[in-house]
Amino acid sequence: MALSKLFSSACWLNSTVNSPNKPKFAPEQEEEDNYKESALSWIYEKLPTSFVPYAQLVRLDKPTGTWLLYLPCAWSISMASYHANLPLNQTISMLGLFGIGAFVMRGAGCTINDMWDSHIDRMVERTKTRPLASDKITQIEALSFLAIQLSAGLSILTRLNLYSLVAIYPYMKRVTFWPQLFLGFAFNWGALLGWPAMLDSSDFTVTLPLYASGDKKYDKLVDVKSTALLFGSNTRKWLSLFSGAMVSLVALSGYANVQGLPFYLISVAGSTTHLFWIVHKTDFDKAEECGRKFRMSKWTGGVVWLGILVDDIWKRVMM
């Protein structure tokens, strides 16, 4: 699921290059991170006022990140269920457990990222309204909230060891042009955990650059590194390469798991079509379009999961 972050970081740098007369951080350049612009921003109106900054901190109205973290877990769990013909109640229970864990740990990752980058977020239009950047909460309050998140994550999912990988991402933006690679490891680690969680044995990231593309002009201005800056005008070629690698590995994992025809028709063919449509139809000069395509990337993972589920149902019916 790692192409979406790189894809969303290739756009704003292009708009800066193409519009040299604009101020570096012009007020009119506000982007989709403003909370009131979200389709789910009504959630904040239902919460007590004191809870709102913390809900904003975990991006409660922006579930795409949770989906990108959860779907690799769901693939692995569902493939294990298919492989061993496990009872549906066991599969559903594990899917629910990992779902809660994905929500909690994605929120913890957002908290860590915002704590580390609050001074930079204040200079970027897309992120300047975040709770820490806008001083709605303090670093101490955020740290206390993070402790609660990590405690909840530990009690819910002791096997989902995402903290160490999530925590290192903000630092990687300062030392390497490949921070999305490390974030991709964090988002896809669940693909390695779902199977052993189901079977007590051990027997696959592609869309993160999309997200990074949305911020690349600001990354350059504040000297933060990203794959979008590294790839530059070759972003589409790199994303095509990573997309091909992803769908090839999905197909290979299906072959190794003896998946049936529904898997290849839906998971492989469907995700291939959707990924390459995203990569080749995106205008990297338009930050808002990159943001929309990033949010659509969850459907790539959803298609893969759908194929696994349909294949499992087909197998159970035919047996």
Go through each PLM region and give its residues:
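Multi-pass alpha-helical membrane architecture of UbiA-family
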Residues: 1-319
